[in-house]
Amino acid sequence: MTRIGTPLSPTATRVLLCGCGELGKEVVIELQRLGVEVIAVDRYANAPAMQVAHRSHVINMLDGAALRAVIEAEKPHFIVPEIEAIATATLVALEAEGFTVIPTARAAQLTMNREGIRRLAAEELDLPTSPYHFADTFEDYSKAVQDLGFPCVVKPVMSSSGKGQSLLRSADDVQKAWDYAQEGGRAGKGRVIIEGFIDFDYEITLLTVRHVGGTTFCAPVGHRQEKGDYQESWQPQAMSPVALAESERVAKAVTEALGGRGLFGVELFIKGDQVWFSEVSPRPHDTGLVTLISQDLSQFALHARAILGLPVPLIRQFGPSASAVILVEGQSTQTAFANLGAALSEPDTALRLFGKPEVNGQRRMGVALARDESIEAARAKATRASQAVVVEL
């Protein structure tokens, strides 16, 4: 039976969040609502989730000794990774010593890079995926491209938000795609995955929650990407019953293999009734921001319940809903947002401004949310709200 104490007291139930972006911020808010004491950790100060946590620490999260020192000092009941770039070997060791990692340290380790999770899905679980090769050198990469043919996709095995990702259409793209992948990898230069291109009709995120009562699926989330980075998402994505059933089978297989409890974002390619596994995040997913307006329990509320061992008896979906990101380009440490009244002038709209302390280049700084009578209308409304926001750098 779940028992939650009083924050900042000897009975407190403590959660330590590793990574403090906008997704972590919403998770912290949901945990706070349930009376949990939250400690936020990231590599930079004043990150979004730090602004709503009880306290925070700034460390290099790829430094295992620094991560261990914070965890041993704070003694959290639950360690919750919010990003991939963490010293996962340290999480594995801490889990073996009795700490609880959400969903599991193995899940964090396998999903830290694309190779671990792709080999699990394709080679161990025999799930349908695109054809693929891994390469460490330009020579091996060139051979893989030749073998798979054009078009194909190259990505660093360790990167997020589309960084370093390219679609190769001809031999002219081979060198520049390699160079871009080497620049975009999270741990610096290195290994890449080359994938055969699937001519899919659409892609979805199937938000899958493993909780005390079993496994529950949210309605499928459709999304549009640019350069591998999410621009808008909507729910529910229309699918054939056959494709939806197969999507749930694939999502259940991969989340069961990763184990533990929590919310997972399972990315899938769909063509007609066919489904291919793409990737999985063992945590809330950026495309799932739409659930802040589309469901009675957002993906963040679901994650909080699952972490704490609370049941999810039912998820109510409110009908056609959409999200559109507020993307800011430039440089500033004091970004301001204006014209918000116009952005919120239509019924069934909402905004989330993430409170990121700086922008240097291009950065997602907020999201507009909307509901309407159809997906098309909801998408258009969310986009209008997003575009109405005036950004002052």
UniProtKB/Swiss-Prot annotation:
UniProt cross-references to PANTHER family, sorted A to Z: FORMATE-DEPENDENT PHOSPHORIBOSYLGLYCINAMIDE FORMYLTRANSFERASE
Official protein name in the record: Formate-dependent phosphoribosylglycinamide formyltransferase
Matches recorded under PROSITE patterns: ATP_GRASP
Keywords: ATP-binding, Ligase, Magnesium, Metal-binding, Nucleotide-binding, Purine biosynthesis
Domain of life per record: Bacteria
Organism expressing this protein natively: Pseudomonas fluorescens (strain Pf0-1)
GO terms of biological process kind: 'de novo' IMP biosynthetic process
Domain ATP-grasp: start-end pairs: 119-308
